């Protein structure tokens, strides 16, 4: 199937989806309605671009016809030639855009995510920077209309985070934040530094797609569940009922502790969400390593230890080392305005995939 047949098939399906979504039987079936709505939304940009492309093709035909029928009118012929030139340039632009839109989509792109941030090298300063990153992602999520929920947090004595886990829910969350996994380095003068020297610290970020139970089934025999008395949030009934939950996946020794909620059941549900995502991510990493993973050939390994970005406070500079992007607007980015960085990473990834496809 050539590119034009693919595009026509996408448009035909889009029109079919429009009819289905107005069918009373579909509207009354919430699950099916949501699935079809999501499919329609995922094809919308492609269909809009394809329809605009077809109009450009018609503009070329019209301009060529005008040149033939100019009847010696030099001004009319000149105008038609300019229109033809512009339309042909537009045609090339649309063809590149449509190739990108037809690239195979990451099946996880529409998913919610589990976001883990940890203070790494640098002690208290690293923990404080982990808090800065948490705020950055939280503000970005708010701007996108996403829901941001802190599920688990371990703080240090100066208000930073040893580790914090959040759930980010909304439209296409993973597609935009999947490039954030890795080591984020900060260069700044810590508040505790009396000599004014710049210190370098690191916080690590891991972005994992949310994994539903039906998608990834963990054998209950592989889990050890411990119930104990909460020492933090949920402490109002700490002396009456043991509400905190620790779940260990025995084959990998991956563990999650949850005590943020006031009931054992809610803590258990949240802990299972996190451990399901971590275990699935663990085995996905192994599989990708064995296959010379896509993320190694495009934008890094996605590994927590790979340095991906530097935030330099004295120079108000952010550098993404994977794509050589440098922006002198650190304050803007840390305030949650991540679009310029995210868009550059998405474009780079798409370009790399397109080059691979054309080889």
Curated annotation (Swiss-Prot):
One example GO MF annotation: translation release factor activity, codon specific
Modification N5-methylglutamine, positions: 236
Gene Ontology CC annotation, any one: cytoplasm
InterPro entries assigned to the protein according to its UniProt record, in alphabetical order: PCRF, Pep_chain_release_fac_I, Pep_chain_release_fac_I_sf, Prokaryotic/Mito_RF, RF-1
Posttranslational modification: Methylated by PrmC. Methylation increases the termination efficiency of RF1.
Bridged cysteine pairs (disulfide): none
Record key words, sorted: Cytoplasm, Methylation, Protein biosynthesis
One Pfam family here: PCRF
Cell compartment(s), UniProt: Cytoplasm
Alphabetical list of PANTHER family matching this protein: LD18447P
Family: Belongs to the prokaryotic/mitochondrial release factor family.
Record's function text: Peptide chain release factor 1 directs the termination of translation in response to the peptide chain termination codons UAG and UAA.
UniProt name for this protein: Peptide chain release factor 1
Organism from which the protein derives: Streptococcus pneumoniae serotype 2 (strain D39 / NCTC 7466)
Gene: prfA
């Amino acid at each position: 199937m050539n590119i034009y047949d693919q595009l026509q098939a996408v448009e035909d399906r889009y029109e079919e989806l429009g009819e289905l979504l107005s069918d009373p039987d579909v509207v009354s079936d919430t699950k099916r309605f949501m699935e079809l709505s999501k499919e329609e939304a995922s094809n919308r940009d492609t269909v809009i671009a394809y329809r605009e492309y077809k109009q450009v093709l018609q503009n070329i035909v019209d301009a060529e016809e005008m040149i033939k029928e100019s009847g010696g009118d030099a001004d009319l012929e000149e105008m038609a030639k300019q229109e033809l030139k512009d339309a042909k340039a537009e045609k090339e632009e649309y063809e590149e855009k449509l190739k990108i839109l037809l690239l195979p989509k990451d099946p996880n792109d529409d998913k919610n995510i589990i976001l883990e941030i940890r203070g790494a090298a640098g002690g208290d300063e690293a923990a404080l920077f982990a808090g800065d990153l948490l705020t950055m992602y939280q503000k970005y999520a708010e701007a996108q209309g996403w829901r941001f929920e802190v599920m688990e947090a371990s703080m240090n004595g100066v208000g930073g985070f040893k580790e914090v886990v959040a759930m980010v829910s909304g439209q296409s969350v993973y597609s935009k934040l999947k490039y954030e996994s890795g080591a984020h380095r900060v260069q700044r003068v810590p508040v505790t530094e009396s000599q004014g020297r710049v210190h370098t610290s690191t916080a690590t970020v891991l972005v994992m797609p949310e994994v539903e139970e039906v998608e990834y089934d963990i054998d209950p025999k592989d889990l050890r569940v411990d119930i104990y008395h909460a020492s933090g949030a949920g402490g109002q009934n700490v002396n009456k009922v043991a509400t905190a939950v620790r779940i260990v996946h025995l084959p990998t020794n991956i563990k999650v502790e949850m005590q943020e909620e006031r009931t054992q059941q809610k803590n258990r549900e949240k802990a299972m969400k996190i451990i399901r995502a971590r275990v699935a991510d663990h085995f996905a990493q192994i599989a990708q390593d064995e296959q010379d993973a896509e993320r190694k050939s495009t934008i890094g390994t996605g590994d927590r230890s790979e340095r991906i970005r530097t935030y330099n406070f004295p120079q108000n500079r952010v550098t993404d080392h994977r794509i050589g992007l440098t922006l002198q607007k650190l304050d803007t980015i840390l305030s949650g305005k991540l679009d310029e960085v995210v868009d550059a990473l998405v474009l780079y990834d798409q370009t790399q995939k397109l080059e691979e496809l054309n080889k």
